[in-house]
Regions:
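Metal-dependent active-site segment of extracytoplasmic phospho-/sulfohydrolases and closely related
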Residues: 371-414
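His/Asp/Glu-rich, glycine-adjacent segments
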Residues: 100-101, 105-345, 474, 486
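Short, structured active-site-proximal loop/turn typified by the sulfatase FGly-forming signature C/S-X-P-X-R
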Residues: 56-106, 230-232
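Bacterial N-terminal signal peptides
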Residues: 9-20
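Active-site neighborhoods of enzymes that stabilize oxyanions during catalysis
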Residues: 179-181, 186-200, 213-218, 227, ...
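Active-site-proximal N-terminal segment of extracellular/periplasmic enzymes that hydrolyze or transfer
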Residues: 29-76
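Bacterial N-terminal signal peptides that target proteins for export
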Residues: 1-11
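Signal peptide processing junction and immediate N-terminal pro/mature segment
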Residues: 21-31
Length: 519
């Protein structure tokens, strides 16, 4: 019997709960190696993306008989766990699968840059690698631009495109999704839906670096698979097959289920959602989307593959991420989809996302999302109990990341495009170099920039510009109250690390090619 140690990691102030399902006598002070006499053979890992420790505490206080309350009271709760830094779906997901932070894994974001690779699409690798984008996200799909089902004419002012729900057209030819339930038949190895021409190119082989080979350390799936046990995972992009780990050939996750969340949201009857958006910008749609992954997990707990058609045995490690809470924290949208007698569907009215203004109390939309997650966890636990797996299964509930700020009145939105353009223009004026200084980066609730000139002087230039220039922020107005704009100092930033300081912050050598030059 292989002894396995379950490690839960979560964001600052997030919930991390480890529960041996049948251990009714479990206490939070139980020794780490004490499983109450039960031999754990299966671990169900659940990431409730976006959930905070305060959300968990609030929900349990309001719903003391809920499944979340039962699991917390029967398990060990870690209330001061920390996420990766930076914190987002990735590197947060990679942290859960490896136990590593970006220093160890080499993954800083799903959209980043590497100074030691050739740009995507390079076929002739001569001379030193100039650096290039390292993007492992939905643009990597083979069908990245399916025309809008509601507005398919490019001349329509509302025309837009989405990646295909099945990534590469394996279920829906041309990405024409008229029956989203068919997604359950998605391949357990969806790598064929990835467009390798979008990946950075390895200078030593002049070949694209596959997502799993970009990781610098192995993953839990590699360990378990190598030990002869079955593995499964469900997530929002096929590119998250990166969790297979380096050198795996993408084969250490036996059953990966990754419907593309950035595809156009379609109601169960094949009608596009009236909000005309993707699965991540309408919480009613997000719940439908999460439901496919929940069904995949239940099928796997029942001993089948994610489609429920092949009997393969219950995986030793399996799980999924929930998106409903994360979306309900940040996107004003309907919360429910109701089926009508004639087979059509009706969405509820749009509700405000996040928390009640001035508080960290979940508003109705977020409360509904927490209810949804709780109900799906109850389904999973019921399945575990019904299948006789309770004495041999542990559940880990955690989060890849949180969402900030919780109090919506603290939210200040600052467009980054004008700032980047101004930095590049100032650099040209100073040096005469007409090439953009900032060539890549991600600016979310943080700022990270990669520079075309990797010197301390260039990094200091960006830092000094950001610190000495104000920016205009749009204040929270989702509730209909026009609070106007506000001039914020230091480009809206609180702390800036540049060059050697950025390397020291992440704990890597200055010569490391992956960390952001300015953070």
């Amino acid at each position: 019997m292989h002894k396995l140690r379950a490690i839960a990691a979560a964001a600052i102030g997030l919930a991390a709960v480890v529960i041996p399902v049948a251990a009714g006598s479990a206490h939070s002070n139980r020794a780490a190696n004490d499983h109450g006499g039960h031999q754990i053979k299966h671990v169900l890992l659940i990431s409730v993306d976006g959930i905070h420790q305060s959300d968990l505490e609030w929900y349990i206080s309001q719903h003391p008989g809920s499944e979340l309350a039962k699991l917390v009271h029967k398990g060990a709760e870690f209330s001061n766990a920390r996420t990766s830094d930076p914190s987002d779906s990735d590197p947060g997901g990679t942290a859960l699968m490896t136990g590593g932070d970006p220093r160890a894994t080499g993954v800083y974001y799903d959209v980043e840059y590497n100074h030691d690779v050739f740009p995507p699409g390079t076929t002739t690798c001569t001379g030193p690698a100039p650096g290039g984008n390292a993007i492992y996200d939905s643009p990597d799909d083979k069908l990245p631009a399916v025309p809008d089902f509601l507005h398919p004419n490019p001349s329509d002012p509302n025309f837009q495109t989405f990646p295909s729900f099945d990534e590469g057209g394996s279920i829906f030819p041309g990405g024409n999704d008229t029956n989203p339930g068919l997604i359950m038949g998605l391949s357990p190895h969806p790598q064929s839906g990835l467009n390798t021409a979008t990946f950075p190119v390895d200078p030593s082989t002049c070949k694209p670096i596959m997502p799993w080979d970009y990781l610098k350390v192995n993953t839990i799936f590699q360990v378990i698979h190598s030990a002869g046990m079955r593995t499964a995972w469900s997530d929002k992009h096929a590119v998250y097959t990166s969790f297979n780990g380096p050198g795996s050939g993408g084969a250490s996750i036996d059953d990966f289920f990754g419907p593309e969340i950035d595809s156009q949201a379609v109601e169960p009857n094949g009608t596009p959602y009236p909000t005309d958006t993707d699965w991540a910008h309408d919480d009613a749609a997000t719940k439908q989307y999460d439901g496919y992954k929940v069904q995949a997990v239940i099928n796997e707990l029942n001993g089948f593959d994610h489609s429920g058609t092949q009997q393969v045995g219950t995986p030793a490690v399996l799980g999924m991420n929930f998106q409903a809470v994360s979306v309900a924290e940040k996107v004003d949208s309907p919360s429910t989809l109701t089926k009508n007698a004639d087979g059509t569907y009706t969405e509820s009215p749009t509700e405000l996302a996040g928390y009640l203004p001035g508080t960290t109390t979940p508003g109705p939309l977020l409360s509904s999302a927490l209810d949804y997650v709780n109900a799906q966890l109850e389904r999973m636990v019921d399945t575990i109990q019904h299948d006789g797996l309770a004495k041999s299964t542990a559940i880990i509930i955690t989060a890849k990341h949180g969402q900030s700020p919780q109090n919506p009145l603290l939210l200040k939105r600052i467009p980054d495009g004008p700032i980047i353009s101004a930095v590049n223009a100032a650099w040209t004026a100073k040096t005469g170099d007409t090439n953009p200084l900032i060539v890549a980066g991600t600016d979310d609730d943080l700022w990270q920039s990669y520079l075309s000139v990797k010197t301390q002087d260039a990094a200091n230039f960006v830092k000094n510009y950001l610190w000495t220039h104000p920016a205009t922020a749009q204040l929270y107005n989702n509730d209909g109250v026009d609070r106007g704009t506000e001039s914020v100092a230091h480009s809206g930033l609180a702390q800036i690390y540049a060059g050697h300081d950025a390397a020291a912050f992440f704990g890597v050598p200055y010569s490391d090619p992956r960390y952001p030059d300015v953070f």
